[in-house]
Amino acid sequence: MADASIPKPGEEKEATPCPSILQLEELLRAGRASCSRVDEVWPNLFIGDAATANNRFELWKLGITHVLNAAHGGLYCQGGPDFYGSSVCYLGIPAHDLPDFNISPYFSSAADFIHRALTVPGAKVLVHCVVGVSRSATLVLAYLMLHQQLSLQQAIITVRERRWIFPNRGFLRQLCQLDQQLRGAGQS
C-alpha cells in the first residue's frame, strides 16, 4: 500500500522538503479510518474526544494512566488534576483550533510527556481535544516525529491507518517546519 514508498525511520539518505499543505491534506483524506470517539494510534497511545476524556469510567475501562488535554481550559473539557485525582497523570495545553494559533511551542513538552508516560510499564496515554481531530492529532504527530523519528508524512500515514484526523492548515504548516528542522531541510 502507501507504506511501500515511504522510507522507514533512519532510511532517509538526505533531507527532503516537506510536502505542500495541499499534498498533506490529500494524504489526510486518503483511505478510510475510524471515526470512533477514541482510537489507539500507536501502541498504548490513544487519540480521543472530550466526551471520552470526561468519562472517568471509560478511561478506567481503557486503562488510561495519562491524559494530555490539548484544549485545556476550553468550554467542553473538564479535565485537570482535580477532575482525575491521583489515578491519572495530567498535562493541559491551552491550544485553540485556529490556523493562526502557534501550537509549536507545545510540541516538545507534549512529546516529552507522552514519551515519559510510554516508558512506564502498563501506561496508556489519551491525547484529546474537543473532537480528537486537529489539536490532539497535531501533538501526537509531533511526538511521532520527535521521539519515534518518523517524518511528517510517515506520522500522518501511521495515525491515519487507525483514526481519521485533519489538523488545520496552520498546524500543518507548523508540523512542516518541525519536519524540516528535524531533517535539516532548508538550511544552507
From Swiss-Prot:
Gene3D superfamilies referenced in this protein's UniProt entry, alphabetically: Protein tyrosine phosphatase superfamily (3.90.190.10)
Protein family according to the UniProt entry: Belongs to the protein-tyrosine phosphatase family. Non-receptor class dual specificity subfamily.
Domain of life: Eukaryota
Protein name from the UniProt record: Dual specificity protein phosphatase 13A
Keyword terms: Cytoplasm, Hydrolase, Protein phosphatase
Function: Probable protein tyrosine phosphatase. Has phosphatase activity with synthetic substrates. Has a phosphatase activity-independent regulatory role in MAP3K5/ASK1-mediated apoptosis, preventing MAP3K5/ASK1 inhibition by AKT1. Shows no phosphatase activity on MAPK1/ERK2, MAPK8/JNK, MAPK14/p38 and MAP3K5/ASK1.
Enzyme active site: 129 (phosphocysteine intermediate)
One GO CC term, this protein: cytoplasm
Keyword Cytoplasm: yes
PROSITE patterns per the UniProt record, alphabetical: TYR_PHOSPHATASE_1 (PS00383), TYR_PHOSPHATASE_2 (PS50056), TYR_PHOSPHATASE_DUAL (PS50054)
Main location as per UniProt: cytoplasm
InterPro entries recorded: Atypical_DUSP_subfamA, Dual-sp_phosphatase_cat-dom, Prot-tyrosine_phosphatase-like, Tyr_Pase_AS, Tyr_Pase_cat, Tyr_Pase_dom, TYR_PHOSPHATASE_DUAL_dom
